[in-house]
Amino acid sequence: VTTVLCRPENGFALDPDAIPDDADLVVIGNPTNPTGVLHPADLLRGLRRRGRLVVVDEAFMDAVPGETGSLARERFKGLVVVRSLTKHWSIPGIRAGYIVGDRTQVRWLADRQTPWSVSAPAIAATIACTSRTATPEARDRAATLARWRDFLQGGLRGRGIDYAPSAAPFVLARLGRGAHAALRERGVAVRRADTFPGLDSTWVRIAVRPPGMTNQFFTALDAVRLLQPTS
């Protein structure tokens, strides 16, 4: 297994040349966790090769207004898209998702699916979240998240804090060493990012929340004097 790192100096963009030519399976999140970077659809299509399966995890694509860059509507041999219902609808305990792709590939995977792999509550949630009435609600949620995300990123930018421009319901920011613990002491929880390959303890992942909650985060951040990125 080869882990391909997306570097901050390149805006966490994927370098397709970094993927080994002989890789028969390539898995990538789009938007990627924890950077929130939305990789161009053409770049992901270009990863296909004879004898290779490309799996694109679009668990956070619902947060992108209009789902720009999604490959879920395309059917290419050698390409499978994984989608989740638990992120956008805030139902993590349901554990429901689905795949889309070439009919032959989907049938091959279905034949190997574990019996009773989806619970009755998960089935009910899936039906509800994919219904016609859910579609406008999903669009509204994406638009609202975009406004909240802009507010968060604007506050980070105004404070001179380095962050990765995000298309996801979170933002990766470089608050400095000790920020995670210092914020927690003030009642604010952010996700430590040093558990992700290629990142250190200066980075944290911040959830996109309503402006009122985001202002509480900024108040705590200002109080701990972590206003500039540190190495």
Task: Give the label of every model feature segment.
Residues 150-174, 194-201:
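Conserved small-domain helix->loop->beta segment predominantly found in fold-type I
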Residues 185-186, 196-231:
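PLP-dependent enzyme catalytic core of the Aspartate aminotransferase-like
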Residues 52, 78-79, 188:
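Short, conserved active-site loop motifs that form the nucleotide-linked donor/cofactor pocket
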Residues 101, 173-176, 208-210:
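Short beta-strand-to-loop capping motifs
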Residues 78-157, 161-164:
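PLP-dependent aminotransferase class I/II
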Residues 42-50, 70-75, 108:
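Catalytic-core regions built around general acid/base machinery
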Residues 7-62, 228:
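Active-site phosphate-binding strand-loop segment of PLP-dependent enzymes
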